Design a protein with these regions (language model features):
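A C-terminal cap/extension of S-adenosyl-L-methionine-dependent methyltransferases
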Residues: 138, 187-256
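A short glycine-rich, Lys/Arg-flanked "PGG" loop and its adjoining helix->strand segment in the class I
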Residues: 121-133
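A short His-aromatic
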Residues: 113-114
Length: 256
């Protein structure tokens, strides 16, 4: 996605209101409360912070010790517009990002889809080294390769994941999966239909891959409210489901 300024503009414009982002941000906040109670002094790193939407959400909830970096100059610029002094830095060189700093929480959402297996494992090993005792690593990623559709082509996404893959990465890097599962379960049937239709269009050459844009856009307010309500219901009844378009994983350091 690096180099696609228009996609970062969409992200920046919708991160505080689009149902999908709001649900993800609530899930992260819930994880922090589950793990750390009401502590607001956590030192949190968002590695691959995009346009700073998650950092903004965390700040609004009282977390102040926030850091972030991204490999996109556009993303960094948008994050700085929100008042965050995020760094321009590549995740593949994470070991050189303030190498002596440690964190209670490291977050890396929807970035692994641009990396290969060995790169992911190496990055996880560095994250493990940087976590303080009792700390956690949180990662959200797109799920199931067949759900790619035009969104994946537009953003040049090379990989989608299943939970077992992330569990294997965790084990190889010295992590244990504390919590893991899928979400957007209630919306999975319509998402699957739309993405399957998009895949057919791509296969038949009915759409021009060079002119595609992502699925990130804000629907009409009533629709957005309805979808956000569906996600709130799911978060309450089935926060980690057996199916969904995203896979959410929380890892802790393996001891012994």
């Amino acid at each position: 996605m690096i180099g696609k300024r228009q996609e970062y503009e969409r992200m920046h414009a919708t991160e505080q209101s689009l149902w999908w982002y709001r649900s993800l941000h609530r899930r992260v906040a819930h994880t922090l409360t589950q793990r750390f109670g009401e502590r607001k002094d956590l030192v949190i790193l968002d590695a691959g912070c995009g346009t700073g939407g998650l950092l903004e959400s965390l700040r609004q909830q009282g977390y102040q010790r926030l850091e972030g970096f991204d490999a996109s100059e556009d993303a960094v610029a948008f994050s700085r517009e929100r008042g965050f002094e995020v760094a321009f830095h590549n995740l593949l060189a994470v070991e050189s990002y303030h190498p002596t700093r440690t964190y209670d929480v490291i977050i890396c959402n929807d970035v692994f889809c641009y990396l290969n297996d060995s790169q992911i494992i190496q990055i996880l090993k560095e994250f493990r080294r940087r976590l303080r005792p009792g700390g956690v690593f949180i990662t959200n990623n797109n799920a199931f390769s067949w759900l790619g559709g035009t969104h994946a082509v537009a953003l040049k996404i090379s990989k989608r994941f299943v939970l077992s893959e992330l569990t294997a990465y965790a084990q190889q890097a010295g992590f244990h999966v504390w919590k893991g599962g899928y979400w957007s379960f209630l919306l999975f049937p319509p998402i699957a239909v739309v993405r399957s239709w998009q895949n057919l269009q791509l296969k038949r050459g009915w759409v021009n891959a060079e002119t595609l844009s992502s699925d990130v856009h804000l629907p009409a307010a009533p629709v957005n409210q309805l979808l956000n309500g569906c996600m709130k219901l799911e978060e309450t009844l089935l926060p980690l489901a057996p199916l969904g378009s995203s896979v959410y994983t929380v890892m802790e350091v393996t001891h012994g």
